[in-house]
Amino acid sequence: MEFNELMNAFAAKCGLAGVEAEDGCVVLEFNDIPVAFMENDAFESLVLRAVIGAPPPETDGSLAKAMLRANHALCNACGATLCQDPETKEYAAVLTIPLSIADADLLAKAVGNIVKTVNTWQGVVASGTADQSADSRLYV
């Protein structure tokens, strides 16, 4: 399915009027979380990106370590990859879906997963630390 066709089918599923991509990107908000939907022509895929937030200045490195653990087998991130933007230093959740298998239903599930991941990790980032004892709450 083409990017614009997919985004309009997803918008209809969400009860929205058609959406217009700007520079290959559409931003929609779910539960107060903006999710960017970006077309990646090089890999014929759709990339979803949602910002988790900036780490507190006094972070001791435990957040980054916890995110690396969460990325292991994607078990603590609902299939998303947790990362840090090198320019803004903000943490984000990123999920890639091949356009060849994407449809409105799959996109709805992906959005649910990325929103759940961001909600969970916003709490962890706000606390400023994620030690081993916190791991059980990180499973989303």
Predicted feature locations:
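Short, highly charged C-terminal tails/helix-capping segments
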Residues: 126-140
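Hydrophobic residues embedded in beta-strands of well-ordered beta-sheets
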Residues: 26, 44-46, 89-91
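Structural motif
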Residues: 22, 40-42, 87
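A short local loop/turn or secondary-structure capping micro-motif enriched for an aromatic residue
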Residues: 45-46, 56-57, 100-103
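A short acidic-to-branched-hydrophobic micro-motif
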Residues: 37-39, 44-54
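Short, internal acidic amphipathic alpha-helical interface segments
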Residues: 51-90, 94-96, 139
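Ampiphathic alpha-helical segments that act as solvent-exposed interaction surfaces
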Residues: 66-67, 71, 97-129
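Charge-rich, low-complexity N-terminal segments
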Residues: 1-36, 75-77, 83
